[in-house]
Amino acid sequence: DFEGKPLVNEDGTPRVPTYPNTMKQNFLSSFPSHENFSLFQLEDTEYFNAFGGGVPIYLNGKKEIMNCYDFVHFDGPHTTEKVLEEAMFFAPRSRVGTRFVFDDHDTYEMSKIAYVLIHFGFRTTEMGKTKCMLEKVE
């Protein structure tokens, strides 16, 4: 998990990794002037099931359903299969200008994920040591 502990309990049952509050605070400190975003700390399937039809947003006393994402930060789990599953959820819910940032891309096959996302109009725009950014250009 994020703290280096095995993902299996002593009795052999799988253990769900935690997202410690310190990681959340570190993430949020990188966006001091961006107040208009929501950070959901949910497991993938929990998020997909809850918000597959959109996220309810309340603005000026009105409820709107947001089902198009402008920015998605992928930070774990770090397997090609799971990251691709996440990307495939968000790709059809994106628009031109949407940016996907993948953390720790060297721990999975980022080239395969980028190749699949080409078919959704994404192109790799920046590649760093630990992060990779793709942007939807068409």
Region roles according to the model:
Residues 1-138:
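S-adenosylmethionine/decaboxylated-SAM
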